[in-house]
Swiss-Prot record:
InterPro entries: Enolpyruvate_Tfrase_dom, Enolpyruvate_Tfrase_sf, EPSP_synthase, EPSP_synthase_CS, RNA3'P_cycl/enolpyr_Trfase_a/b. The lineage of its organism: Bacteria, Pseudomonadati, Pseudomonadota, Betaproteobacteria, Neisseriales. Pathway: Metabolic intermediate biosynthesis; chorismate biosynthesis; chorismate from D-erythrose 4-phosphate and phosphoenolpyruvate: step 6/7. This is 3-phosphoshikimate 1-carboxyvinyltransferase. Monomer. PROSITE patterns: EPSP_SYNTHASE_1 (PS00104), EPSP_SYNTHASE_2 (PS00885). Belongs to the EPSP synthase family.
Length: 433
């Protein structure tokens, strides 16, 4: 029987939330530290299913990692060459582990088997594999063409130094290639073919690579130039920012409930694009205060939450939260340019449409957009399916702030990025029933 949690109709208390570490930064940092030529102590790393899969993989590849007090880790870099030249790596549904590891292992070469849960085998990886093959990699599909699982063999350097790659399905393909090619020691030019989505995630990658000693020239997000003789050298200590995508639920709660909520661990100078979510809330009625290590959202009681029609390409993960905020506007709202939702942990456009309809909303799906017309009052005690997608579970918790109880199936799917989410959320609320 499916486990579920019932959230009663609730009011929000003025609150401060210390965010867990960013998943995007955590897994990039682990891999870069493992490939460095020195030792790096990582602070505030996210503890979750996705980071566990990366840590397990690095262990199987022979990377020495010490677990210290207070969740700190000491990663002993391998100098850009994993000790174990063959391994069987199970990576769950962790795209932030699967894609970068695929590229790094393909560039280094060896005998590697990469696989995951069934959904991971439905998430495309062909654009990355095509680019890696141009760079001389030996990558074989073990199931359906263009999808995991994969076998990686020995790379043959064919001398090609200009690598085209598509970026319209997932920016993680470009991230993976950017992080892997410096391991060759050769100069490379990566050229985008067509549109590049989710550019802020590329900014995270480039800023982290720079912290690890590799400067990539970014020419208008069309051409990326990797210098010759590059190698990774880690900072002695690195602090992982709080998760800006995870912040979106609490910031949206502050807007919906017209109650101040502050999140700590991110701020005005965050390297994560999803901090822009707070700016989108500002446009539709929120008061936002920015600090160096916090963002605070509130709304005056007399000010309505305004409807929106938003191109959400710059905040694809946090934009899911806006689909719930739409119900507080009492008017039709639209999220556009969200085609990447289709190939995430689930088809998020279809899943969001299905579950919003259970609440009485009228929803129109398009290939890359969703139109949401809220009900007068959401249906009480709607049973929300979460599709093994952490963000579906966290988004729909906000329904309890709209005056009705809601039942969330499989709440433990939040373990992918935020294992304590429901405990934290409940601690911020008071039952209104």
């Amino acid at each position: 029987m499916t486990e579920s949690v019932r959230l009663p109709a609730a009011s929000l208390k003025p609150s401060t939330v210390a965010l867990p570490g960013s998943k995007s930064i955590s897994n990039r940092t682990l891999l870069l530290a493992a490939l460095s030529d020195n030792v790096c102590e990582i602070h505030s790393l996210l503890k979750s299913d996705d980071t566990d899969r990366m840590l397990e993989a690095l262990d199987k590849l022979g990377v020495q990692i010490e677990h210290l007090a207070e969740g700190r880790l000491k990663v002993h870099g391998t100098g850009g060459r994993f000790p174990n030249r063959s391994a069987d790596l199970f990576l769950g549904n962790a795209g932030t582990a699967f894609r970068p590891l695929t590229a790094a292992l393909a560039v280094l070469g060896g005998g590697y088997h990469l696989h995951g849960v069934p959904r991971m085998h439905e998430r495309p990886i062909g654009d990355l594999v095509d680019a890696l093959r141009i760079a001389g990699a030996d990558v074989e599909y073990l199931g359906n063409e263009h999808y995991p699982p994969l076998h990686i063999g020995k790379r043959q350097d064919c001398g090609e130094r200009v690598i085209p790659i598509k970026g319209n399905v997932s920016s993680q393909f470009l991230t993976a290639l950017l992080m892997a090619l410096p391991l060759t020691g050769q100069a490379f030019e990566i050229r985008m073919v067509g549109e590049l989505i989710s550019k802020p995630y590329i900014d995270i990658t480039l800023k982290l690579m720079a912290q690890f000693g590799v400067q990539v020239a970014n020419e208008g997000y069309r051409v990326f130039k990797i210098p010759a003789d590059a190698h990774y050298h880690a900072p002695e200590h690195l602090h992982v920012e709080g998760d800006a995508s995870g912040a979106s639920y609490f910031l949206a709660a502050g807007l919906i409930a017209a109650t101040p909520v502050r999140v700590t661990g991110i701020g005005a100078n965050s390297i994560q694009g999803d901090v822009a979510f707070a700016r989108e809330l500002e446009k539709i009625g929120a008061d936002v205060v920015w600090g160096e290590n916090f963002v605070e959202v509130s709304r005056p009681k007399g000010r309505a939450v305004q409807a929106f029609d938003l191109d959400a390409n710059h905040i694809p993960d946090a934009a899911m939260t806006l689909a719930i905020v739409a119900l507080a506007t009492r008017q039709t709202c639209t999220l556009r340019n969200i085609g990447s939702w289709r190939v995430k942990e689930t088809d998020r456009i279809a899943a969001m449409a299905n579950e919003l309809r259970k609440l009485g909303a009228k929803v129109v799906e398009e290939a890359e957009a969703i139109h949401i017309t809220p009900p007068e009052t959401p249906t009480p005690d709607a049973v929300i399916d979460t599709y093994d997608d952490h963000r579906m579970a966290m988004c729909f918790s906000l329904i309890s702030l709209l005056g009705v109880p809601v039942v969330i199936n499989d709440p433990k799917c939040t373990h992918k990025t935020f294992p304590t989410y429901f405990e934290v959320f409940s601690s911020l609320t008071e039952t209104a029933e």
